[in-house]
């Protein structure tokens, strides 16, 4: 996308995320995005709390954030920065396409602040692939590569 079609945004708060992502409670898995560099890289922030519904069953005696939700949070971060860079009036929809090389290194538990580092490694037409690393307190807890397709709102109907 050319600079003429992009906006410049360095951080996104929850209101910005709600404006571009279709996800809502309990499936909006990022609270904020910082260090945004166009649609190339950024860091999502997820504050993990015991109040999240998945902890009632995963696992009641030792709550651990499911790995699939960590990957989803990575994908939401990548999708959000792609959509946030589009000019106002050009809404889009992100479709999660693939997950590759997912690895889970350490459990994520309530009270953790999950940092989701995403970096675009490939783009072809409207499909982007991102390298993602999740960290807690500077320690890598998970990693994956995710790909998504961005379409305009008109194309998705």
UniProtKB/Swiss-Prot annotation:
Pfam families: FabA. One of its GO terms (molecular function) is (3R)-hydroxyacyl-[acyl-carrier-protein] dehydratase activity. Its main location: cytoplasm. Keywords: Cytoplasm, Lipid A biosynthesis, Lipid biosynthesis, Lipid metabolism, Lyase. GO terms for cellular component: cytoplasm; membrane. Its EC number is 4.2.1.59. It comes from Brucella anthropi (strain ATCC 49188 / DSM 6882 / CCUG 24695 / JCM 21032 / LMG 3331 / NBRC 15819 / NCTC 12168 / Alc 37). It comes from the Bacteria. It catalyses: a (3R)-hydroxyacyl-[ACP] = a (2E)-enoyl-[ACP] + H2O. Belongs to the thioester dehydratase family. FabZ subfamily. GO terms for biological process: fatty acid biosynthetic process; lipid A biosynthetic process. Involved in unsaturated fatty acids biosynthesis. Catalyzes the dehydration of short chain beta-hydroxyacyl-ACPs and long chain saturated and unsaturated beta-hydroxyacyl-ACPs. The active site is at residue 58. It is found in: Cytoplasm. This is 3-hydroxyacyl-[acyl-carrier-protein] dehydratase FabZ. PANTHER family: 3-HYDROXYACYL-[ACYL-CARRIER-PROTEIN] DEHYDRATASE. Coiled coil: none annotated.
